[in-house]
Structure formats: C-alpha cells, structure tokens
Amino acid sequence: MIFAKGHGTENDFVVLPDLDAALSLTPSAVAALCDRRRGLGADGVLRVTRAGAARAAGVFDRLPDGVSAGDWYMDYRNADGSIAQMCGNGVRVFAHYLRASGLESADEFVVGSLAGPRPVVLHGFDPARATTAEVTVEMGKANQFGAGSAVVGGRSFDGLAVDVGNPHLACVGITADDLAALDVAAPVSFDPALFPDGVNVEVLTASVDGAVSMRVHERGVGETRSCGTGTVAATVAALAHDGADTGTLRVRIPGGEVTVTVTESTSYLRGPSVLVARGELDPHWWHAVAG
C-alpha cells in the first residue's frame, strides 16, 4: 500500500493512490494515519481516484454537479476522519502528485471534488525537479451568506460568512502583533444556527500594500499552517472590508504565501506544492487501525 507525503504552504497531506477506490478509509484509519505520533502525521488524507470509480465504490451516491465519471477525483478526509467538501491546498498537492507520478501528462486538467470540478494549471512544471510545483486552482465563486461572530483564543471577532465549497467565517481587523499572539489552536465557538455543520475560522489583518496576514482554525483539525479555501474566504472578506467586490491579494499564512484573485464569477488560488516523501504502509498496521 503505497503513499506519498506532500504539503501546500505547510498544510500537509498523506496522498493515497487508489485508482479503484478499493481502500476502506474508515474514520479510525484516517485519524490514525494523520496522528503525528502513532501514524505518518498530516492535516488530512487525499485519496487519488477517478470520479466514476469513487461512485462505483460507494464513496458517494451520485457524481457531484459538474464532475464527469472520467475526471480525477480528490477524496479528501480531515485529520479526524470526517469527509470535507473541498481543500484548496489539497487540490494543489493532488494535481502536483498526478503530474509528478506520471498518472497525468497534461499541465492543465480538472480535479473533481464534492464541491464540484476544480480546473488546475501547473506553471512551468519540470519533471527533472518534480518535487516542487507552482499550481493555480480555479476555486469557483466564493459566496457570502451573512455575518457572524466567533470566539477565538478568548477573544470575540465579527466576521463575514463565506462559502468556498465549504463554510468559513473570515474576521478582518486584528493587528499583526495581536494576530501573532492569538491562541488559534484552542477550540473556537461560533453560531451553530449559521454554521450547523461547523465552520473554518480565519482571523486576519486588514490589507496593506496588497497583502494580508492570516491564521486559521480548521474544523476537524484545529490550527493549521495554511488553509487554501480559507485564504480565498479571507480575500473576499478583506476586499469587502475595503469596499471592493473583486481584486487580487497576497495572503501570508504561517506556512508561506499564496496569491488569491476574486472576480465577479469565480476565484483563483495560486501557490506552491512540495512532495517530500514516498513509501509503503505496513498492511498489518493498516488493517489493525482500519477496524
């Protein structure tokens, strides 16, 4: 049972090539795999398969809107084993893995997800330097759906609710010094009526010279070094804070920097991907943790 390990701005993933979608990704198996002491350690798991194979295996009952049976499909699981609709950093790593492993020969193709199709572009990919890549993902339209508040690190923040294929509350206005000192790892509280399935919470500075700084508490994970969909939500909120609906911002997260462009009809996330390891999981260990 082979695997790869990669990260997008230090949001790290275990990649499991499983073209027939035959693996039993139980919550207990995913949680063990992502545990940094008893497994490989990661913020999530990316199963590499085709959408048609995932449907046939019962991963979902019907193809997500806009996704074809022949499309690559990113079956993404959070570190606690729960299923997530979308992960922007994960799509970059997923696309990079496909190209670096030879499963995909084109530099532009579509990655399917529960949130729908995500077109990707690998910029100047060099097979001789396949461990690194620069990838743009078309993330779709980011939709605002209200205002809310959250308590993070003992402080209350007002924010903008944004749907990027998954729910976010992006809270603009903290100073850079206060952001650095904020305890984002602690559990957060939020309005369950607005976010019945939980929410990813971003706390960020207002934009200065075309850039913001952000930290994120991801549902099912806790604080991560980066969150791709979160950077899109943060950009939408920062632009709205400045009275704009569209624009481009650089978003600085603890794991690095990405560039997000928001248009009237869609959004784009561009950033790095790094593949750091390949290996083989012990089948006896896997069967033991899969339950």
Curated annotation (Swiss-Prot):
One Pfam family of this chain: DAP_epimerase
Primary location: cytoplasm
Pathway per the UniProt entry: Amino-acid biosynthesis; L-lysine biosynthesis via DAP pathway; DL-2,6-diaminopimelate from LL-2,6-diaminopimelate: step 1/1
Superkingdom as given in the UniProt entry: Bacteria
Gene Ontology biological-process annotations: lysine biosynthetic process via diaminopimelate
Keywords, alphabetical: Amino-acid biosynthesis, Cytoplasm, Isomerase, Lysine biosynthesis
Swiss-Prot/TrEMBL site (Could be important to modulate the pK values of the two catalytic cysteine residues) positions: 168, 218
Active-site residues, record numbering mapped to chain: 87 (proton donor), 227 (proton acceptor)
Keyword NAD assigned: no
Disulphide linkage map: none
Key word Isomerase present: yes
Residues binding substrate: 11, 78, 88-89, 166, 200, 218-219, 228-229
Localization per record: Cytoplasm
Catalytic activity, as annotated: (2S,6S)-2,6-diaminopimelate = meso-2,6-diaminopimelate
Family from the record: Belongs to the diaminopimelate epimerase family.
Task performed by this protein: Catalyzes the stereoinversion of LL-2,6-diaminopimelate (L,L-DAP) to meso-diaminopimelate (meso-DAP), a precursor of L-lysine and an essential component of the bacterial peptidoglycan.
HAMAP family per the UniProt record, alphabetical: DAP_epimerase
Subunit description: Homodimer.
Protein name stated in the entry: Diaminopimelate epimerase
Species per Swiss-Prot/TrEMBL record: Mycolicibacterium smegmatis (strain ATCC 700084 / mc(2)155) (Mycobacterium smegmatis)
Gene designation: dapF
